[in-house]
Amino acid sequence: MNLIPMVVEQTPRGERSYDIYSRLLKERIIFLGSGVNDDVANVIVAQLLFLEAEDPEKDITFYINSPGGSVTAGMAIYDTMQYIKCDIATLCMGQAASMGAVLLAAGTAGKRYALPNSRIMIHQPLGGFQGQATDIEIHTKEILRIRKDLNNILAHHTGKTLKKIESDTERDNFMSSVEAQKYGLIDEVLVKREDVEGAADNG
């Protein structure tokens, strides 16, 4: 059962109700709270483009609690994050696994955060193919290309060497928020909201 809370605001013209995600969008907050698929990616890409059109100079805050999902859908979000002019602060609550971890690391340098009990996991893309040998070979080459692309992205955003990333993503690699900070996936572990305000003031 999918329950989405509604928020009621008083305006000069009377009451106006928003679903909670639309209300957060008014505050330039985007929330990824599910697996990553094409539908989810299309909504997030549209939100990013809308917020850039509204004000290309103001930051966007991107909250992430995701087990990951489709690489192609995730890359659509990633590329849009890099494409738009706005700085994007990413913040993990709960988990950021697989593609979720890539999106967390893809935030603007110095503005990537996690809450204390968050779990972050990186690994190589998964693949399970059946069919003719030639089809399996085609898919194998594609998943190896995707793995190389993802490893290059993680190397770019963490400052780690490609060889180190390749080794560390060979199997599921779970990290605490503190470990993710040391690794370079995030910049700071936040306990209170004031922490991010202080970090912004110091940036």
Swiss-Prot record:
It catalyses: Hydrolysis of proteins to small peptides in the presence of ATP and magnesium. alpha-casein is the usual test substrate. In the absence of ATP, only oligopeptides shorter than five residues are hydrolyzed (such as succinyl-Leu-Tyr-|-NHMec, and Leu-Tyr-Leu-|-Tyr-Trp, in which cleavage of the -Tyr-|-Leu- and -Tyr-|-Trp bonds also occurs). Belongs to the peptidase S14 family. Keywords: Cytoplasm, Hydrolase, Protease, Serine protease. It comes from Desulfotalea psychrophila (strain LSv54 / DSM 12343). NCBIfam families: clpP, PRK00277.1, PRK12553.1. This is ATP-dependent Clp protease proteolytic subunit. PANTHER family: ATP-DEPENDENT CLP PROTEASE PROTEOLYTIC SUBUNIT (PTHR10381:SF70). It is an enzyme of class 3 (hydrolase). Cleaves peptides in various proteins in a process that requires ATP hydrolysis. Has a chymotrypsin-like activity. Plays a major role in the degradation of misfolded proteins. InterPro entries: ClpP, ClpP/crotonase-like_dom_sf, ClpP/TepA, ClpP_His_AS, ClpP_Ser_AS. The lineage of its organism: Bacteria, Pseudomonadati, Thermodesulfobacteriota, Desulfobulbia, Desulfobulbales. GO terms for cellular component: cytoplasm; endopeptidase Clp complex. Fourteen ClpP subunits assemble into 2 heptameric rings which stack back to back to give a disk-like structure with a central cavity, resembling the structure of eukaryotic proteasomes. It is found in: Cytoplasm. Its main location: cytoplasm. The active site is at S98, H123. GO terms for biological process: protein quality control for misfolded or incompletely synthesized proteins. SUPFAM superfamilies: ClpP/crotonase. Its EC number is 3.4.21.92. PROSITE patterns: CLP_PROTEASE_HIS, CLP_PROTEASE_SER. Pfam families: CLP_protease. HAMAP family: ClpP (MF_00444). GO terms for molecular function: ATP-dependent peptidase activity; ATPase binding; serine-type endopeptidase activity.
